[in-house]
Amino acid sequence: MTARLLRGGPAADALLAEATARAARLPAPPQLVMLRLGEDPASVSYVRGKDRKAREVGLKSTVYALPETTSQAELLDLIARLNADDTVNGILVQLPLPLHIQEQAVLHAIDPRKDVDGFHPLNVGELWAGRPALRPCTPAGILYLLDHYGIPVAGQRAVVVGRSSIVGRPLAGLLLHRDATVTVAHSRTPDLGAVTREADLLCVAVGRPHLITPDMVRPGATVVDVGINRVLGEGGGKAQLTGDVAPEVAQVAGAITPVPGGVGPMTIAQLLANTVLAAELQAKGRAAR
């Protein structure tokens, strides 16, 4: 048996088409502002990709490329000005930040109504209360991907391997609110395979190449691989992207997301969908004044 591939491209296109149609009904194109500190190649690439995709779907995108030496006070002052600007609908601070800046202080400074990453404590609390608006992009994108391919969630035994505040924890919360029975495991879970073999739906976000092997997966399960790891090719050759799930798992699973090309496109699509939603909610709030 070879698993059905759950490619992110078609699902991301569908999500973006919905967001574009909603954006067209707004008085002005939603504006996403992204802040990047320094010239880390990965951060530069990520922001460039988000900026390009935002423009493709008709959003206004503004990028602040700030020096790595920017102080925390200067960054917080810029965020305060963006919070007060009614033409700005979404604010994203590209992580990681330089060591001299406190990440949580920065993320907490963003107006929760413009927090399109879904990391502000207020938005985290709303998620766990079962009434999320701006949801973290990767977990929300995963749910959309599953829905797009008709993968059931309600009533399923879901195992989330990974407990980060960006993916693992919020994904567990979203799955709970979709009536899955959820277990959260991690790299220190004893006998991890015994836990993962119970899963109808296995989501892995640890950042450890090929952590999940075929013997750890129940035959026919759906496997969502969130990991993106750079590993050297055979003989020290060119680095390749690989996931947290070994390729051989595709011979056991019923459905699986590829790496690359699985969850990655969904994260960007959900970011832009969140920007449109933020603009809609802000417009509704202004109309109610």
Swiss-Prot record:
PROSITE patterns: THF_DHG_CYH_1 (PS00766), THF_DHG_CYH_2 (PS00767). GO terms for biological process: L-histidine biosynthetic process; methionine biosynthetic process; purine nucleotide biosynthetic process; tetrahydrofolate interconversion. It catalyses: (6R)-5,10-methylene-5,6,7,8-tetrahydrofolate + NADP(+) = (6R)-5,10-methenyltetrahydrofolate + NADPH; (6R)-5,10-methenyltetrahydrofolate + H2O = (6R)-10-formyltetrahydrofolate + H(+). The keyword RNA-binding does not apply. InterPro entries: Aminoacid_DH-like_N_sf, NAD(P)-bd_dom_sf, THF_DH/CycHdrlase, THF_DH/CycHdrlase_cat_dom, THF_DH/CycHdrlase_CS, THF_DH/CycHdrlase_NAD-bd_dom. One of its GO terms (molecular function) is methenyltetrahydrofolate cyclohydrolase activity. NADP(+) binds at G162, R163, S164, S187, I228. The keyword Hydrolase applies. Keywords: Amino-acid biosynthesis, Histidine biosynthesis, Hydrolase, Methionine biosynthesis, Multifunctional enzyme, NADP, One-carbon metabolism, Oxidoreductase, Purine biosynthesis. Pathway: One-carbon metabolism; tetrahydrofolate interconversion. It comes from the Bacteria. Pfam families: THF_DHG_CYH, THF_DHG_CYH_C. Catalyzes the oxidation of 5,10-methylenetetrahydrofolate to 5,10-methenyltetrahydrofolate and then the hydrolysis of 5,10-methenyltetrahydrofolate to 10-formyltetrahydrofolate. Belongs to the tetrahydrofolate dehydrogenase/cyclohydrolase family. This is Bifunctional protein FolD 2. The lineage of its organism: Bacteria, Thermotogati, Deinococcota, Deinococci, Deinococcales.
